[in-house]
Amino acid sequence: MHNSLAELIKPRTVEVVPHGSHSARVVIEPLERGFGHTLGNALRRVLLSAIPGAAVTDVVIDGVLHEYSTIEGVQEDVIDVLLNLKNLAIRLNGPHDVYLNVDKHGPGPVLAGDIEASHDVEVLNPELLIAHINGNGRLRMTLHVQKGRGYQPVANRAIEGDSAIGTLHLDASFSPIKKVSYVVESARVEQRTDLDRLVIELQTNGTVQPEEAVKHAANILNQHLAILVDLKGEDLPLFGEDGPQFDPLLLHPVDDLELTVRSANCLKAENIFYIGDLIQRSEADLLKTPNLGKKSLTEIKDVLATKGLSLGMRLENWPPEGLKKLNQ
């Protein structure tokens, strides 16, 4: 029997079953045979690499110049303290990175709940042990928390050259997803017994709920695949009759991003006038711009992310001929 595209089975139910702390099982069924692995693998990869989160990226500890030091009056050495800080589950509700302080006298433990957080910062695991203070010891440190995606080693992260002496840089795991796996089981609809049931098991650090993480991952996939729905449609306009194809958003001036005056002026000073110009610059390139620091860089990255763009992208045949006339 000939099967048309209209006869493909589509998922009818999505069941979210919470279990344990910040964990859930997501069941999607029914699916055509093979679609379980297709969707499961794609969702798993996106969940692990593309869900945004926050992490400690830099630490300054009073009396410490490098990570191989010890801290007077503190049981743990510096490396152990830094490793503990990597397990911090923190949510930033504002658009910018933040600096948080810890100032604790001994004796006793230093917990994540001892971090002095502002109203737009939430520590989701306040019971996390950071260090033990002996006797009359004291631990004072400043934590730099940034937003990001995936895992970023220090070597791959743009760092300002004027970092203060004693600043300790951490490899940052921004992903709020702690574990994710999937299995494909057999499903049945009426007389068909060759269908798939996709079961996704995931655990987050509490900064995002499992159901929201899956929705976000599905939305990311949808945005990337939507452009393929109609390759000849108006969603892929031509610049000129025979010219290269560009997303019209890239042809807009950077003023349309509504950046702060400081950030916008810094970009224009570097001859970055269009969004297409901007996305081709790397973080390291922008940090070399006079008067543009990490705060401005974070603002630019956040605004681009809301439009599905990022720094470091590459565009063939850019700029298109006649671009300057487009927005006059």
Swiss-Prot record:
SUPFAM superfamilies, per database record: C-terminal domain of RNA polymerase alpha subunit, Insert subdomain of RNA polymerase alpha subunit, RBP11-like subunits of RNA polymerase
Region (Alpha N-terminal domain (alpha-NTD)): 1-232
Keyword terms: DNA-directed RNA polymerase, Nucleotidyltransferase, Transcription, Transferase
EC class name: transferase
Record GO terms (molecular function): DNA binding; DNA-directed RNA polymerase activity; protein dimerization activity
Recorded family membership: Belongs to the RNA polymerase alpha chain family.
Quaternary structure, from the entry: Homodimer. The RNAP catalytic core consists of 2 alpha, 1 beta, 1 beta' and 1 omega subunit. When a sigma factor is associated with the core the holoenzyme is formed, which can initiate transcription.
Domain notes: The N-terminal domain is essential for RNAP assembly and basal transcription, whereas the C-terminal domain is involved in interaction with transcriptional regulators and with upstream promoter elements.
Family matches, as HAMAP family: RNApol_bact_RpoA
Name of protein: DNA-directed RNA polymerase subunit alpha
Gene that encodes the chain: rpoA
